[in-house]
Amino acid sequence: MQELPSGYKGKILYTADCTRELPADSYFENGATKVAETPVGRYREACNEPLTRFGYRFQIEHPGKPHMAVITYPDDKRRYMCVNDGTCYDLTTGVFTGGVYPVTHTMQRIENIFWPRWKDCSIVFMTWGYGEPAAVQGFSVYELDELPPAQLSGAVAHGGRSLGVQYEDPCGKGASEGAKTFDEWLERHITYLHHTGQNLLVYPINWYHGPQFPSKTQPADAFYVFVAEDRKQYSRSTT
């Protein structure tokens, strides 16, 4: 079991040892996986080909409350791994090891905060770069009691540099933070920024494919992306 980091309180809902074999109603893989026996430890590893992946199904009790997935992965060679829920951006993060980042030959952790939108949830580990396979030892999912603001002191609390999140694509609002409305997305995003000591949010008003505002000269797309109960993404746009 992966423990919560220091300072967090919550209830454990699910834990997985990824080296164990599980039934088809709680585990899947696309492309063969293997259980590797290494000096770092035992872990499950996907194929070298991009988009090969394995994933787990788990249940939570209270959609809309903040949760944390604590994931242990091997830092023993070059890897490029995507982590997501298979549907939207609620649980999305990634891992790079090797290359410009010298490997530590140890197990490392991701501590990923997310707001699940369903009781029936999933988590997927996917190879994204050729020859850089996804690999995980295990993970645990917790429902958190709260997400209090970070306790900042001194000059940091009264200024200092700007630190925050810049969206490359307009993928937020209805497709991340488990949100179903713009107000819900903004509230959760601000809660997360305060919790992590960040003070800046940059969101695109124009991107590769066009503006995010009504325009007389160019079609506007992706005003709003929404993940519905059927687990499909829908979007509004102009023509």
Language-model features: locations:
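Beta-strand signatures of extracellular beta-sandwich domains
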Residues: 82-84
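Glycan-processing catalytic domains of CAZymes
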Residues: 63, 69-76, 86-93, 97-104, ...
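Surface-exposed beta-strand/loop patches in extracellular or lumenal glycoproteins
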Residues: 53-57, 79, 125
